[in-house]
Each structure stands twice: as C-alpha cells, then as structure tokens.
C-alpha cells in the first residue's frame, strides 16, 4: 500500500485515536460551557445578567432603585449588562476552544 500514497496502518490508527480524543474533549468542553454562569453588570452595578459559557441567558437581576429611575435608564443598564455578559462569555468560549484546538493547527480554530 505504501506505493499508493496512503499512510501506514499505525499512522491511521493514531489519527483515529486522536480524532476520538478530540471528540471526547469537545463534548466535555460543551458540558463545561453549559454549566458555567458568567455575570455581566452595568457600570453602576444596578443591572446584572448571567449567561452560560454558550451564551444562553440564565438570570437577570435589576435593583429596585434602577426600576424606580424609569424605563429609559432601566433599558440602558440592562443592555449594558447584557453586552458585558456576552463579551465575557464569548471570550471564555474562544479561550477554551483555543485550549482544545491549540495543537491541531486547524484554520480558524486557534493554534
């Protein structure tokens, strides 16, 4: 088979083992990201939003004094908290994906 440009059986076996390990690691990472709770807050701390590591909304907390300050202020603080939580969540996901794929030299996936 060596004359056909195919890898030897040992190389092929190693490639399959590596692919299986990557699949297991990716599943574990997915579970870890799902279990994470990442908090983003408005600058004044009166609005907080929690997202998972996969950017799924989990909780919202709005301080009573924020609600009393009116609709516009409440909307602005809520949006600020959401943007903060999203930025932290996506950065965490990217960092963890780069850890997983760092040694693979896959285009667009870190490393």
From Swiss-Prot:
Location in the cell: Cytoplasm, Nucleoid
Source organism superkingdom: Bacteria
Primary subcellular site in the record, as a coarse category: cytoplasm
UniProtKB keywords: Cytoplasm, DNA-binding
GO MF, any single term: DNA binding
GO CC terms: bacterial nucleoid; cytosol
Family according to the record: Belongs to the YbaB/EbfC family.
Function: Binds to DNA and alters its conformation. May be involved in regulation of gene expression, nucleoid organization and DNA protection.
HAMAP family: DNA_YbaB_EbfC
Assembly description: Homodimer.
Protein name: Nucleoid-associated protein SynRCC307_0025
Top-level taxonomy: Bacteria, Bacillati, Cyanobacteriota, Cyanophyceae, Synechococcales
